[in-house]
Amino acid sequence: EETIFDFGTLKHRFREIAFLTKGLKIVARDKREEEEKEVTFHYEGGIKEFVQYLNKSNTALYDDILYFEGNKDGVMVEVAMQHNDAYTENTYGFVNNINTPEGGTHIVGFRNALTKTFNDYARKNKLLKDSEPNLSGDDIREGLTAIVSVKIRQNRSLETVKQEGLLTAW
Protein backbone atom coordinates (compact mmCIF):
# COMPACT_ATOMS: atom_id res chain seq x y z
CA GLU A 1 0.00 0.00 0.00
CA GLU A 2 1.33 3.41 -1.00
CA THR A 3 1.17 6.45 1.27
CA ILE A 4 0.29 9.66 -0.53
CA PHE A 5 1.02 12.87 1.35
CA ASP A 6 -1.30 15.84 0.97
CA PHE A 7 0.77 19.01 0.56
CA GLY A 8 -2.03 21.14 2.06
CA THR A 9 -2.08 19.04 5.24
CA LEU A 10 1.70 19.17 5.50
CA LYS A 11 1.72 22.95 4.99
CA HIS A 12 -0.82 23.37 7.80
CA ARG A 13 1.29 21.31 10.21
CA PHE A 14 4.58 22.96 9.22
CA ARG A 15 3.00 26.39 9.72
CA GLU A 16 1.85 25.36 13.22
CA ILE A 17 5.30 24.07 14.16
CA ALA A 18 6.98 27.25 12.89
CA PHE A 19 4.58 29.44 14.91
CA LEU A 20 5.10 27.31 18.03
CA THR A 21 8.91 27.34 17.71
CA LYS A 22 9.88 31.00 17.55
CA GLY A 23 12.66 31.59 15.00
CA LEU A 24 12.45 28.15 13.37
CA LYS A 25 12.50 28.21 9.56
CA ILE A 26 10.80 25.39 7.66
CA VAL A 27 11.04 25.13 3.88
CA ALA A 28 8.57 22.69 2.31
CA ARG A 29 9.01 21.59 -1.29
CA ASP A 30 6.65 19.41 -3.30
CA LYS A 31 8.44 18.02 -6.36
CA ARG A 32 5.79 15.48 -7.31
CA GLU A 33 4.15 17.66 -9.96
CA GLU A 34 5.70 19.16 -13.06
CA GLU A 35 5.48 22.57 -11.41
CA GLU A 36 7.36 22.40 -8.11
CA LYS A 37 5.74 24.06 -5.08
CA GLU A 38 7.82 25.67 -2.34
CA VAL A 39 6.61 27.36 0.83
CA THR A 40 8.68 28.84 3.66
CA PHE A 41 7.41 29.25 7.22
CA HIS A 42 9.36 31.47 9.61
CA TYR A 43 7.84 33.48 12.47
CA GLU A 44 10.13 35.48 14.74
CA GLY A 45 7.10 36.49 16.80
CA GLY A 46 6.16 32.88 17.56
CA ILE A 47 2.71 32.40 19.04
CA LYS A 48 2.02 36.15 19.01
CA GLU A 49 2.17 35.94 15.22
CA PHE A 50 0.03 32.79 15.41
CA VAL A 51 -2.76 34.76 17.13
CA GLN A 52 -2.38 37.55 14.57
CA TYR A 53 -2.64 34.99 11.76
CA LEU A 54 -5.76 33.39 13.29
CA ASN A 55 -7.38 36.80 13.80
CA LYS A 56 -6.70 38.08 10.27
CA SER A 57 -10.34 37.85 9.17
CA ASN A 58 -11.67 39.60 12.30
CA THR A 59 -11.28 43.06 13.80
CA ALA A 60 -9.15 43.14 16.94
CA LEU A 61 -10.70 44.94 19.92
CA TYR A 62 -7.27 46.22 21.03
CA ASP A 63 -3.98 46.58 19.18
CA ASP A 64 -1.57 44.58 21.31
CA ILE A 65 -1.51 40.82 21.46
CA LEU A 66 -1.12 39.94 25.13
CA TYR A 67 1.81 37.59 25.74
CA PHE A 68 3.01 35.79 28.84
CA GLU A 69 5.66 33.16 29.41
CA GLY A 70 6.99 31.30 32.40
CA ASN A 71 9.08 28.31 33.37
CA LYS A 72 8.68 26.18 36.48
CA ASP A 73 10.31 22.84 37.24
CA GLY A 74 11.12 22.14 33.60
CA VAL A 75 7.67 23.09 32.31
CA MET A 76 7.65 26.11 29.99
CA VAL A 77 4.34 27.85 29.33
CA GLU A 78 3.62 30.48 26.69
CA VAL A 79 0.29 32.22 26.22
CA ALA A 80 -0.71 34.72 23.54
CA MET A 81 -4.20 36.14 23.26
CA GLN A 82 -6.33 38.89 21.77
CA HIS A 83 -10.06 39.60 21.68
CA ASN A 84 -11.81 40.32 18.40
CA ASP A 85 -15.29 41.20 17.16
CA ALA A 86 -16.38 37.56 16.75
CA TYR A 87 -18.78 35.88 19.14
CA THR A 88 -16.88 32.63 19.53
CA GLU A 89 -13.85 31.63 21.55
CA ASN A 90 -10.90 30.08 19.73
CA THR A 91 -8.43 28.76 22.28
CA TYR A 92 -5.87 26.27 21.01
CA GLY A 93 -3.67 24.19 23.29
CA PHE A 94 -0.39 22.49 22.48
CA VAL A 95 1.92 20.28 24.53
CA ASN A 96 5.41 19.83 23.07
CA ASN A 97 4.07 21.27 19.79
CA ILE A 98 1.30 18.65 19.63
CA ASN A 99 -2.24 20.00 19.33
CA THR A 100 -4.53 19.03 22.21
CA PRO A 101 -7.97 19.52 20.61
CA GLU A 102 -9.74 17.96 23.59
CA GLY A 103 -8.27 20.60 25.89
CA GLY A 104 -6.49 19.43 29.01
CA THR A 105 -5.41 20.82 32.35
CA HIS A 106 -3.37 23.53 30.62
CA ILE A 107 -6.53 24.88 28.94
CA VAL A 108 -8.66 24.52 32.08
CA GLY A 109 -5.97 26.32 34.09
CA PHE A 110 -5.72 29.10 31.52
CA ARG A 111 -9.49 29.65 31.40
CA ASN A 112 -9.81 29.65 35.20
CA ALA A 113 -6.89 32.07 35.60
CA LEU A 114 -8.29 34.39 32.92
CA THR A 115 -11.74 34.47 34.53
CA LYS A 116 -10.29 35.09 38.00
CA THR A 117 -7.97 37.83 36.75
CA PHE A 118 -10.76 39.68 34.93
CA ASN A 119 -13.07 39.50 37.94
CA ASP A 120 -10.35 40.53 40.41
CA TYR A 121 -9.51 43.51 38.20
CA ALA A 122 -13.17 44.48 37.81
CA ARG A 123 -13.74 44.37 41.58
CA LYS A 124 -10.52 46.20 42.46
CA ASN A 125 -11.29 48.99 39.99
CA LYS A 126 -14.98 49.23 40.98
CA LEU A 127 -16.18 48.12 37.54
CA LEU A 128 -18.37 45.58 39.35
CA LYS A 129 -20.34 46.56 42.43
CA ASP A 130 -20.19 44.34 45.51
CA SER A 131 -23.81 43.36 44.92
CA GLU A 132 -23.18 42.29 41.30
CA PRO A 133 -22.20 38.74 40.38
CA ASN A 134 -18.85 37.95 38.81
CA LEU A 135 -18.50 37.96 35.05
CA SER A 136 -18.86 34.49 33.59
CA GLY A 137 -15.96 32.78 31.88
CA ASP A 138 -18.04 32.47 28.72
CA ASP A 139 -18.61 36.23 28.62
CA ILE A 140 -14.93 36.98 29.22
CA ARG A 141 -13.81 34.56 26.50
CA GLU A 142 -16.30 35.74 23.87
CA GLY A 143 -14.27 36.80 20.84
CA LEU A 144 -11.03 35.52 22.33
CA THR A 145 -8.32 33.96 20.21
CA ALA A 146 -5.62 32.35 22.36
CA ILE A 147 -2.70 29.97 22.04
CA VAL A 148 -1.55 28.07 25.13
CA SER A 149 1.71 26.27 24.48
CA VAL A 150 3.27 24.02 27.11
CA LYS A 151 6.69 22.44 26.66
CA ILE A 152 7.77 19.67 28.98
CA ARG A 153 11.29 18.25 29.24
CA GLN A 154 11.49 14.94 27.41
CA ASN A 155 12.44 12.99 30.54
CA ARG A 156 9.13 13.90 32.17
CA SER A 157 5.89 12.29 31.14
CA LEU A 158 2.76 14.35 30.71
CA GLU A 159 1.06 12.16 33.33
CA THR A 160 3.79 12.97 35.88
CA VAL A 161 3.39 16.68 35.21
CA LYS A 162 -0.41 16.41 35.59
CA GLN A 163 -0.02 14.57 38.90
CA GLU A 164 2.31 17.29 40.19
CA GLY A 165 -0.31 19.89 39.29
CA LEU A 166 2.08 21.94 37.16
CA LEU A 167 -0.41 22.44 34.35
CA THR A 168 -3.28 23.65 36.50
CA ALA A 169 -1.70 26.58 38.35
CA TRP A 170 1.06 28.51 36.68
Regions found by a protein language model. Give the residues of each.
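GHKL/Histidine-kinase-like ATPase module
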Residues: 8, 15-17, 23, 27-163
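Flexible active-site lid/hinge loop adjacent to a nucleotide/diphosphate
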Residues: 4
